[in-house]
């Protein structure tokens, strides 16, 4: 490496003996050499190189390979199709027929997680073509062959997801998809196992209970050292929104406890903060939440809903449970509006939505989710959740005052003040 580095920096080739103990019999002058080195690797590897050879790295011309393509018009989509055909010809594999392209594009957008982005990775393209070619009888991959390949892949890689679903269906993990419950909500999470090629989603039951106390919000996951830092941050943001909205002049007279039920591993991320906030509001207002609806998304301190990852897996995980138990037409999921562009759902789920058997609601603010879950507005005219919570706070404060001072002392205090 030292000799190669000298050749690159000096742009000359020196004749040296392979054996340092035996020099060349004659001295040969160095020769001019036009040499370039192309280093290809991930950012972590390039960072190591930059640390080891800062002078050489400073002279390098840096560039990046794009592994995805954003298509906004027909020309870009046509260029991507040509790229797929080029890979098929190089590998001597059949290319997609006209009816196979929509399925391949759907799979591509699902892989990238964006409806307007397709993968450029030759490895990804090769895998799709090779697996589909096994079900192809002609010179082109038909839509039927592509569909068969995708279905077989889901079946091959779906064992763990099916076992987790069985735990819920056999009521070993308690998830309700009908009825109402105070302080309980179905959140959505993504499960990834090392060495397993497919992530899958499943609902998680979040519960919240409140009682008279000093205003503490207890994060059970954090107390049990099962909650990560990002989850803790989401909890604090959620609390800040609620305290700001209630406009309290004194400390909240309730203590609340929030937890992921039947969760025995570390929980991290803020994608459940909107669900936790809804459960907290339900418990404070003593208003039940519709268990037919699951929810995912994070919130900021102003109650605005922010996008999260793993959306397709989350929705499909809850849909599968509802489907196995029987679709009622009232079940669905609430997602951030910013996540709509990331939807790339299975054909079965899309058909259920089209038949009004399952619903997907996209929202921008937490106040849009609360009426769907509790049948009450957060704020406005008539009976609202905010008003209900404030009334319960006032009642709790009065009870606390009565317990603190016996009635004769209260009477004396009232007389002296007059």
Regions found by a protein language model. Give the residues of each.
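Peripheral, non-AAA+ core regions of ATP-driven protein-machinery
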Residues: 2-4, 20-24, 141-143, 211-224, ...
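Conserved C-terminal "switch" segment of AAA+ ATPases
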Residues: 50-51, 57-58, 62-123, 138-140, ...
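Short hinge/gating elements
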Residues: 42, 61-72, 82-92, 109-118, ...
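Conserved P-loop NTPase nucleotide-binding/switch module
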Residues: 1-12
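Canonical AAA+ ATPase core
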Residues: 10-75, 90-91, 324, 339-342
